[in-house]
Structure formats: C-alpha cells, structure tokens
Amino acid sequence: MDHIQSELAQSIAVSAHKGQVDKAGKPYIMHPAHVAASVQGDAAKAVAWLHDVVEDTPLTFADLRERGVTPEVIEALKLLTHDESVPYLEYVRSLKPNPLARAVKLADLRHNSDLSRLPRITEKDQRRAEKYAKAIAVLEGEGPEGWIDGRGLKVRIDGRVSDTSPHNAISIGQFR
C-alpha cells in the first residue's frame, strides 16, 4: 500500500472529527494523530487515523469504502469497532489475530491510558486506565497455562484476575 491510503484516511478523519474535543478539551483529531504516529506502515496509519470515525461520527463503513478506503483497512476498523453487547476483554481478545487491529488498539490504549493529558484526574479516569492496562496485557501476549502477564497482575484467558497469590483472584467483570 502506498502513502495515498494513509493520506486519504487522515483527510477523512480530520473532516469527520472537525469540532470534536477530547476529555481534556483539546481538538479530538489530536488523538488519532498520536495513534497514527505510534504505528508503523501505511495500512496501520490509515487504520489509526480512522479508528474512531465509525463509532464517533455519522460516517459508516460503506461511506469509507465509497471514499476509497481499502478492504484491508475496513476489515481492521470493523474489528476495532466495539459492539457493546460483547464483554470488553472478549472484544480485545478478538483483535489479536489481526495485526493491524492489534497494533492500532495497543497504540490507542497506551494513548488513552496517559492520564497526564488530563487537567484533573478523577477516580473514573483511574479505573479506565486500569481497565486499559488489562487490555494491553491481553494484546501483548499470552503466557504459560493461559495467563497473560501485565503490570503486576496476571489476567487469565477465562476472565479472572489474580496477583501472584491465587487466593486473591477476583472476577474481571467488575472492570468491564
């Protein structure tokens, strides 16, 4: 894929997110720009620019296809669009087989976890960052016996969380 795809995606994203602001009150387009700068390759950059377009704007996948976005990019975008009826960590696990979706979601989670971007950090922000840390652990790889290591926690594929002491296991449902 050449640079035309990522440039097209950037143009679509800038137009689609015009007037939107993030939690810190800054132009929302700065978020996809940061995510795009954090991934390698034109296809990944195109996905990064567009990763929130279908969820957060009136544009549809059909609109993107009509504007020239490739099937490869649209496939990754469909995976990245979270169906709220699917538990969050199950949705995150579904991204792992697609390298574009996985790379963009990791960059997205890392940027969204950066609480230093916010003027004031609330308890809700801290809970969201903890949720994202678990998602990053899922995407970064699976350890032995179904465990995924991440930031002092061990997240099991079956949806349980434990620190290094098995008696402290808790349901991940409280983090969804």
Range-by-range predicted roles:
Residues 1-176:
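Active-site helical microenvironments for divalent-metal-assisted chemistry
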